[in-house]
């Protein structure tokens, strides 16, 4: 029972961890997280906070502070924050420009307000941030897309 059983146990743990990490990657980053019966209403919502450099800076402060978004999405918005490492599926990667072209501000707001079933995304309004702060954060999230 000595070294061989320990070795087999370590190999099994490494294989399980590897499979978990591969499975943690988001399968379809363009898939909406708003339920089908609510998506039209979410898409119709317009961001009341102007997308100005000042508001983007405020959004960054909220993303990295009060909103705690960086914990899962990472400071660079890549979905690689310290808490995001254990989530399956992984948090959204806001540097994915295809995601930003596909999803409307109202959809992002809906997820911030209601959370997203089957993911680690919890409702942040009103427990952590206000509706206005959520819209401000969305302006900052949009700034992660640098082209494409």
Which residue stretches match the model-derived regions?
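Short glycine/proline- and charge-enriched loop/turn segments
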Residues: 40-43, 86-93
